[in-house]
Amino acid sequence: MYRAASDTKSLAISAATKEVFSYVEALKHGFFLVRKTKLLTNTSIKDIQQVLEHNNAGFRRVPGTTLKNQLGEIVYTPPQNADEIEFYMANLEKFINDDTISELDPLIKMAIIHHQFESIHPFFDGNGRTGRIVNILYLVIKELLDIPILYLSRYVIRNKGEYYRLLQDVRVNNSWEEWIIFMLKGVEETAEQTIYLVKQVSIMMAEYKFKMRPVFGKVYRHELLNNLFNHPYTKIEFIMNDLGIKRLTAAKYLDMLVDLELLKKIKVGRENYYLNTKLIDLFMNFSVEVQDNELNRIITTHE
């Protein structure tokens, strides 16, 4: 990820890394757009998709888009006409932002919004990731989230087969209940995982603070601690900007943190990066643990 941040055109960067980096940037951009207005407009949705896909194509204008299964068979044909797509997206925009239309709980409404968005399939590319960002931003504008930290994509990707089956089942059989329960379960699971992760990060920050204060003494600042946890890595420029200090001072602070074994220094090209390896390990181990728990659940279910 730090390589992607320094040079998104580098051949050494995997496509998956670029995709994650684009997702993070699109989510941050979307949050910036909605946090003050509390509105999620089609203009904002187009902007989010533009950041994701690095193009300005907007909604589909040319027919021919179909959704296929793994065998290559067409299972669903979304609206083809450009005017139709604009019409449906205008209706969806109103449903998202006008609470007088429906008194449904926001979580149930989120599940409906997501299904409608995926069924309209307004873009040539990036519909899935854009739709999942829309989920999170909707919870933000409804003040169920202060910041967009509920990573529903993990749940959707892990249960991809069931996700697509239920999407189609609503289209064919109007089976809304099973779909909504699936999405609510995703919110519940993801919320529990996020709470656990936040608690672990909080514990780790307290441990870092305990080690830093005696060494830094009077020059210790909480902004420095926060900087180490804003990203899995930091560098001299980040410290300079966050603390308002000179380059030599920032470099000195980072070297002190390396000596304390709180950061690991590596060189990428001409730049030095300082990795918070304990934070990286926490996220990596958490990811493996979630996968193991899901595997155990599947095994138990089929015993």
Residue ranges and their predicted role:
Residues 1-303:
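FIC/Doc superfamily catalytic core
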